[in-house]
Amino acid sequence: MSFLSGFFGPICEIEVVLNDADTRKVSEIKTEEGKVEKHFLFYDGESVAGKVNIVFRQPGKRLEHQGIRIEFVGQIELFNDKSNTHEFVNLVKELALPGELTQSRNYDFEFMQVEKPYESYIGANVRLRYFLKVTIVRRLTDLVKEYDLIVHQLATYPDVNNSIKMEVGIEDCLHIEFEYNKSKYHLKDVIVGKIYFLLVRIKIQHMELQLIKKEITGIGPSTTTETETVAKYEIMDGAPVKGESIPIRLFLAGYDPTPTMRDVNKKFSVRYFLNLVLVDEEDRRYFKQQEIILWRKAPEKIRKRTNFHQRFEPQEPQASAEEPEI
């Protein structure tokens, strides 16, 4: 697989071909428009190497330039402030000194053991992307083309992964106990738990478990929170009775969530909550949120050959009181 730039007028095309393009895995990412793009997948510490091909399609053409370079860029862009993009990685390789091209040329490049500290992410209000940027410098207008890559951050099994157990209720009306088997789940995991009814004096019509994603961008008064319901799991439809216990099994693999991201470069965070929702016969809704951590488990081949490590944030998941609660 190669990246193809398209035409720069009638003069030339630019191609970027990775050295391991035949064997490197491709991953998908959903854009802000909802389209799915496929790009080569990299991990933190991996080198990025290949060739830049400047291809003349018509003989006899000439291209004067002030130099040719390639950059490896990691960038955060806030959609509500597109003029203020932040580059947290920028590595440059000069491919050619100023001169003139009269025929097709190719240039080798290699960025050794590149630090890629964050996961690629496209959300409601922010995008974190990695890309190769080829620039042919000219007197008037540079020829520039960008080629996106995808980066996944891998994590080891957490040293501590306590279950979540909590009793909640409305005084003299409803008292329930809920339990989830873990507080940290990998992206293909299964959330297992149970709901136990200790006291039921209101008529519950419906109960469901939601996986809520909260994307927080900005700092201080300019903070924006975007909330999305990633998954819904119907626990019961009908009235429970005292002493009843209802099991929970929510398969994360079917919903393709991202890992939890905390304070990424002081620009944004992505947090996940389990939201227990009860609806009574008068259509009143009761909520209880509990934060969980989602992490990306390394594939078996990567675990065997790579000494990777992602530290989990020291903060334990917390219950949320941002909505009306039980």
UniProtKB/Swiss-Prot annotation:
Name of the protein: Vacuolar protein sorting-associated protein 26A
Domain of life from the UniProt record: Eukaryota
Keyword set includes Secreted: no
Membrane topology: Peripheral membrane protein
Pfam families referenced in this protein's UniProt entry, alphabetically: Vps26
Keyword Nucleotidyltransferase: no
Main location as per UniProt: cytoplasm
Function statement: Acts as a component of the retromer cargo-selective complex (CSC). The CSC is believed to be the core functional component of retromer or respective retromer complex variants acting to prevent missorting of selected transmembrane cargo proteins into the lysosomal degradation pathway. Retromer mediates retrograde transport of cargo proteins from endosomes to the trans-Golgi network (TGN).
Any GO BP annotation: intracellular protein transport
Record keywords, A-Z: Cytoplasm, Endosome, Membrane, Protein transport, Transport
Localization per Swiss-Prot or TrEMBL: Cytoplasm; Endosome membrane; Early endosome
Subunit and partners: Component of the heterotrimeric retromer cargo-selective complex (CSC) which is believed to associate with variable sorting nexins to form functionally distinct retromer complex variants.
GO CC annotation, single: endosome
Protein family (similarity comment): Belongs to the VPS26 family.
InterPro entries named among the record's database cross-references: Arrestin-like_C (IPR014752), Vps26-related (IPR028934)
PANTHER family tied to this protein: VACUOLAR PROTEIN SORTING 26 RELATED
